[in-house]
Design a protein with these regions (language model features):
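Predominantly transmembrane beta-strands of Gram-negative outer membrane beta-barrel pores used
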Residues: 253, 281-290, 298-306, 313-365, ...
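Transmembrane beta-barrel wall of Gram-negative outer-membrane proteins
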Residues: 322-346, 363-406, 423-442, 485-491, ...
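Gram-negative outer-membrane beta-barrel transporters
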Residues: 635-637, 656-741
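C-terminal beta-signal and adjacent terminal beta-strands/loops
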Residues: 349, 353, 721, 730-747, ...
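Short, acidic, small-residue-rich periplasmic hinge/interaction motif at the N-terminus
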Residues: 35-45, 79, 88-122, 148-156, ...
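Periplasmic N-terminal accessory/gating domains of Gram-negative outer-membrane beta-barrel systems
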Residues: 76, 129, 135, 153-155, ...
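Outer-membrane beta-barrel signature, preferentially recognizing the C-terminal barrel domain
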Residues: 421-427, 431-435, 470, 519-521, ...
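Flexible loop and strand-edge segments within Gram-negative outer membrane beta-barrel domains
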Residues: 393-442, 450-474, 514-517
Length: 836
């Protein structure tokens, strides 16, 4: 019933928008609408092919011209069309040429040529790039073609062929306008693919509009894409367990339009819940983070929606073997725009091979198991973004997101009682940007975020009910002021107030047991940083001051980011940062929350320390034409980590000890691009060790200590319709703790326990996987486009072990049973998407 009302609401909303909103261009006039007015005015009839004229825009309103002959002369002189009188009433309109050639020049606002801009036929995958003079030429075009101009750091331009002809020289001049960030901060415009860029501060940025294809994926999963970067790993194939430079997953902070997300995933971590159709770009920051960002001692991930109001309504619908979705962007008027999207799992109708593979991967070794007939799992997400442009200097944005995952598991005894687990996220945020004058900019943002995890578990012949709950509530207010001394030097300062509450509850009805833990932290932060950037240098130095009231602690966190570029080809950089975070995840017991999502959020207090990190890195990037080599060396120390948050499943899994982690590594990326092929090879060499003095005097390998990891990939662009991608990954096995073979169990007081050997002294076999995707453009007609994508994860269907642990043998207490966590099996997926 809830699903019915939810879908009914969104269907009604879409009908209202489609039926009530009409958007008109204020800078040009539709040729088709104008000639209809001319027909009425002069009592004539035009003959034409609709596809030839429907995209043409005119700079003048020809229906206001006084005579018919002047109108026909204007058409003949200012378009690619020929208007010919057949008789006194009928007029024929036809293209002058079957194939059209255009040329032009691209400039920035200062009149400087833009080199290497992409000039592409919209909806197709071929085009050209602009020369050093900003010049471009395209041939064999039709009058219905639309041409798109793209250059990283600048807003894209979309023009019909008819708008790109000058009656005087046949070469037009176009000016491209910069996006929000400064172009001088962009160092590599095409990093691996044309959808990725690397900024001078080391940030890797994914532009979703340019995203084409990634091996194994049929949808642009933003968090999955991050794993093609060196130093970004997921030891268990889950995006909820992404490790950046060996930091565990809760050490990554994810912001969606300034809103902190505590769980941005579906299927308990297998796929991203952030809809890519409304998200413009994703930024991944490994080191040298700006002082304005808090938390995330290992990385900061920024997901941003578009801040630019669109002139026309756009949207799309799509479906794959996991879910179906839709999105729409509606300009209500020239100042207000509403964007919304939804996605829903489709297993209510049928269980696809993809769903079964994901289900088996997610629920293996849990109370649910792999029997889909006794379970009912579903998920959905909703995104809403409202943009209000008060004037040219002031923009207000309101965002809302809801993420829901529900699982009901029915016991096989025929009873109506069901084990349940619900994982939800709700958040609303507001951001106000103001350009006070040419030198001063201000931003004020705030959000309310809620994360909840709830499970009901029946045991002992349905007589015992265990309820477990974990909840995080967070309110935040942030204000920043940026002062530009000149084009090169700026100073940014600000204040942030965070209030975070964490609840953990366990309730058992028989025997009666109730444990409730509540913690509230108020965090005051002040930050300031100076930034200098020119053609050669990028320098940013700042400091963040934090006060945590619950533990009465203050931290001072310096952040430094320096980069120097020689001749636009060679770059050297050095980065340093200190960071802290007061929330983290722990595992109390492996059967918590049905054994599905065993991690729960906790907060720093008198027993749980504040997590602190220090990281230093140096690197160099060399680029020459279409070749790229990127190198980085890093060293990171983290203190205050909990052993119960490291994912141990051995003799220390239930202990609450705090310790430290050190990680050192080398990251290498090689990339070669051509018009038809994109090739990349990444390699990471790293070592990550833990120290908990209460159990060991020396460091021992961390659970995510993957010493060697390498990825190789190819993207092939066969023609404007067909693209494929294939990649392979191979990495060394992760550590695990074996048992004492001579005596598998021992007595610990009144209990028999597994007799483990040395912690993480053994390693699993090497892991490897091959993924493949193919993308075919089914339809590109007028303003509608349709794509069919097919992808396979684990093409070779390799059955691999991701983790090994031991439990007591239920039939023989002197024996231990080995439990293996297996990788995702051969997983095909198919998607169909239509956009307009």
């Amino acid at each position: 019933m809830k699903l019915f009302y939810r879908n009914k609401f969104w269907l009604s909303l879409f009908i209202i928008f489609f039926s009530s909103v009409k958007v008109n261009s204020q800078n040009s006039f539709s040729f088709l609408e104008e000639i209809k007015l001319v027909e009425i005015k002069f009592d004539v009839k035009f003959s034409y092919v609709i596809s030839t004229v429907e995209n043409i825009q005119l700079q003048e309103k020809i229906s206001d011209i006084s005579t018919l002959n002047e109108i026909l002369a204007y058409i003949n002189s200012n378009t690619f069309l020929t208007a010919t009188k057949i008789d006194e009433r009928f007029i024929s309109i036809a293209p002058k040429l079957d194939k059209i050639k255009i040329c032009g020049y691209l400039y920035d606002k200062d009149g400087k040529p833009i080199n290497n801009a992409t000039v592409i036929i919209s909806g197709k995958f071929y085009g050209t790039i602009s020369s050093e003079r900003g010049e471009f030429t395209l041939e064999n075009l039709t009058i219905s073609d639309n041409i798109e101009f793209r250059y990283l750091g600048y807003n894209s331009i979309l023009k019909n062929v008819n708008e790109l002809i000058s009656p005087i020289s046949n070469c037009i001049k176009l000016t491209m306008v910069e996006e929000e960030f400064e172009l001088s901060e962009v160092f590599i415009k095409n990093y691996i693919t044309n959808s990725l860029a690397k900024l001078k501060d080391g940030t890797v940025q994914l532009n979703t509009k340019n995203f084409n294809i990634l091996s194994g994926q049929v949808e642009p999963d933003l968090l999955q894409t991050s794993q093609i970067l060196p130093g970004v790993e997921s030891p268990n194939e889950s995006i909820s367990n992404i490790n950046v430079r060996n930091g565990v997953s809760d050490q990554n902070v994810i912001f969606w339009d300034n809103i902190k997300m505590y769980n941005p995933t579906h299927f308990f971590g297998l796929i991203s819940a952030i809809n890519p159709n409304l998200t413009k770009k994703i930024s991944i920051i490994k080191n040298g983070t700006s002082a304005k960002y808090n938390d995330g001692v290992s990385s900061t991930i920024l997901l941003e929606t578009d801040n630019t109001l669109q002139k026309k309504m756009s949207g799309g619908i799509g479906a794959n073997f996991i879910s179906y979705d839709g999105f729409i962007s509606v300009p209500v008027n020239d100042k207000l725009e509403l964007k919304t999207s939804f996605r829903n799992s489709n297993n209510d109708w049928f269980n696809t091979p993809t769903y079964k593979a994901y289900f088996n991967k997610t629920f293996q070794n849990s109370a649910v198991g792999t029997n889909t007939s006794n379970s009912n799992f579903s998920f959905y997400d909703v995104n809403v973004s409202l943009l209000y442009n008060l004037n040219e200097s002031n923009l207000l944005k309101v965002n809302y997101i809801k993420i829901n995952n529900d699982l009901n598991y029915y016991e096989s005894d025929g009873s109506n009682l069901a084990d349940k687990i619900k994982q939800n996220s709700d958040a609303i945020g507001l951001t106000y940007n103001s350009k006070i004058n040419s030198k001063i900019k201000a931003e004020v943002s705030g959000y309310h975020s809620k994360y909840s995890l709830l499970s009901n578990n029946y045991q002992n012949n349905q007589q015992q009910l265990t309820i477990q709950e974990n909840e995080v509530l967070e309110n935040s207010l942030k204000a920043t002021l940026n002062y530009a001394f000149n084009d090169y030097l700026s100073l940014e300062t600000g204040y942030q107030l965070n209030e975070t509450g964490v609840l953990s509850r366990t309730n058992v009805n028989d025997p009666l047991y109730n444990r409730v833990q509540r913690s509230v932290m108020i965090n005051h932060s002040a930050f300031s940083e100076a930034k200098y950037t020119d053609n050669l240098w990028f320098m940013r130095a700042g400091v963040r001051f934090n006060y945590f009231d619950k533990i009465n602690q203050t931290t001072i966190e310096p952040r430094i980011n320096i980069s120097y570029t020689f001749n636009n080809n060679l770059n050297f950089n050095a980065r340093f940062e200190t960071k802290s975070q007061y929330t983290s995840q722990v595992i109390d017991y492996l059967d918590d929350f049905l054994g599905v999502e065993t991690r729960r959020w906790v907060m720093a207090d008198e027993n749980i320390p504040l997590i602190k990190s220090e990281q230093f890195s140096v690197g160099s990037t060399f680029k020459k034409n279409t070749f790229l080599m990127d190198l980085s060396l890093f060293h990171k120390n983290i203190t205050g980590i909990l052993i119960s948050g490291q994912g141990f499943q051995n003799q220390v899994q239930n202990k609450r000890l705090d310790g430290e982690q050190k990680s050192t590594g080398l990251e290498v990326l090689l990339n070669q691009r051509s018009k038809k092929i994109e090739f990349w090879l990444s390699y990471t060499l790293s070592a990550s060790d833990l120290l908990f003095k209460q159990i060991a005097e020396n460091y021992f390998p961390a659970n995510n200590d993957i010493r060697h990891s390498s990825t190789i990939g190819f993207n092939f662009h066969f023609n404007e319709r067909l693209n494929t991608s294939i990649s392979g990954i191979i990495k060394s096995g992760k550590p695990f703790t074996s048992i004492n073979k001579e005596q598998e169990t021992i007595q610990n007081g009144n209990f028999t326990v597994v007799n483990y050997a040395a912690i993480n002294a053994e390693r699993l076999k090497a892991y490897s996987r091959v993924d493949f995707s193919i993308n075919y453009l089914l339809l590109k007609k007028q303003t509608i486009q349709s794509n069919l994508k097919f992808g396979i994860l684990n093409v070779l269907n390799k059955k691999q072990i991701l983790n090994t642990y031991y439990v007591l043998d239920q039939n023989d207490s002197s024996k231990a049973t080995e439990i293996n966590v297996k990788s995702l099996a051969f997983t095909p997926n198919l998607s169909l998407r239509v956009t307009f």
